């Protein structure tokens, strides 16, 4: 289908960040925020070359004068016009390629509505004229990236988390669970608990600062109550952070209270089960014969699993729920922030995968519904 010199493009569209690059590479070339911004004010300076929309980092840097929109909410595309802008930006500005010359592998959230897959397919063939394309489920790609074909993936990004049991390369849809608790919620929660300490963060620009604090200083406690006592009795857990204006703030128990919400969503006023329970529930929805393989291959993926201590805590919590003799192994690869993209890069460069692409010819013959027959 595709010549060796024409590398496939791999595009992983997340709620928070878009990751894009070439199949065969070991990391994405372009990583930028999945945002589209439009000016709030009328331009007054002629010849400034002001645009009617900005995408990604440029939108982020001009956010003071723009209205920002996220076309992907909770992992699912909700605004196709803006999504098209993001793809256009990905191909032409970030990767600097002509999409009509490369096969494109896109990723989708688990349980993505059928109409959405068709729309993605249609846009790729009709707007960007790609010679071939394929749509793969994000969690499945993360599992490939860890070198497995069977296991359960807990994938948590900025907008949504999922537990996806996979057996011999196929996701088991009846056992997939979605949890609308992810990075953005943790950032909001950290903003809230920092306010209680007397630091005020409210604007979207300040939210980015808090996101940085979260990424640099937060961690998951092995024993939450114990850690709270340690934090109360000594200052050993305190860390300082310098704000862009030079002011230095100190944070203590907020460092582990923030990601604790993953295990105790009640902190956010949510009634849902924590990530350990959700993982367990997902395994229990699977056939009794394959549970052992899932417990022994629990893979973490996505940016919101990057907190230090999360794997040990997950091990402890799942062990407490599982049958006593069960062997439980939590796999947290160091590159898990990009493991979906890496899995896509691996998949698209396999020789055995080359007959799996949906070609332009097949699309012209069958229309968008071809995606359900070829991508599953």
Curated annotation (Swiss-Prot):
Carrying Tele-methylhistidine, the residues are 74
List GO molecular-function terms, semicolon-separated: ATP binding; hydrolase activity
Q: Which reaction does it catalyse?
A: ATP + H2O = ADP + phosphate + H(+)
Compartmental location: Cytoplasm, Cytoskeleton
What keywords would UniProt list here? Acetylation, ATP-binding, Cytoplasm, Cytoskeleton, Hydrolase, Methylation, Nucleotide-binding, Oxidation
Q: What post-translational modification information does the record give?
A: Oxidation of Met-45 and Met-48 by MICALs (MICAL1, MICAL2 or MICAL3) to form methionine sulfoxide promotes actin filament depolymerization. MICAL1 and MICAL2 produce the (R)-S-oxide form. The (R)-S-oxide form is reverted by MSRB1 and MSRB2, which promotes actin repolymerization.
> Predominant location of this chain?
cytoplasm
User: EC number(s) on record?
Assistant: 3.6.4.-
**Does the keyword field hold ATP-binding?**
yes
Chain positions with N-acetylcysteine modification: 2
Q: Which GO terms describe its cellular component?
A: cytoplasm; cytoskeleton
User: Which family, according to UniProt?
Assistant: Belongs to the actin family.
The protein, known as: Actin, cytoplasmic
